[in-house]
Amino acid sequence: MLEEHINSSNLTKKAKTSDKSLIYLHTEAYFKIIYHSLCYANKQRDKNNWLEVMGFISGTVSQDKTKTYEIINITKAWPISHGNSVSVTIDDYGKSLNKIMTDLSKTNSTILGWYHSHPSYGLFMSQTDFETQKSYQKMYDKAVALVFDHTIWSSINTGIEAYRLLPDFRTFEKIPIQASNGFEMNLNIPLYHLFMNKIDDNIIIEELDI
């Protein structure tokens, strides 16, 4: 899997940053992604045993007040699975999806894509990620993919990036991310040192049943 990551990193190496879309990432969703990732890759666990994680993200999509760009409002993250490789799609998790959709129906939210971790690999989309993202966008063209690497994450770096395929389904673009309060994400990590000091191999986060 590491070899695939290294060989396919060029898929997003030249990705341009979108000026037509902006992600507002709510703190609850961001921290859920962090917790899930650190459950299976942290300083207490042998690096050879680090695992990737995957989950869904949900929220709403709207236009800004000037109607010049879209706002992808990610309000919640849904931990789903972990393993040596995560390439699952919505179709693989019908039972989990039913639980999520029941909850989302009460809030007028929808599935906006997925998140996954690259423990020590860096922030990009691999060939496997490309195929997964393509399947999401065929169902919902605004779907995005979030990638998190805890080895990059720090008090001045969010360790997370967002990607989406352009209409040609061959080229990725980066979607800028801000905290939901409008501040840059780098200014919204007050609990970084708490996370790093407290995370250990005993932390458990609930994943939805498949």
Q: Where are the regions that the model predicts?
A:
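MPN/JAMM (Mov34/JAB) isopeptidase/deubiquitinase module and associated MPN-bearing subunits/adaptors
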Residues: 1-113, 117-210
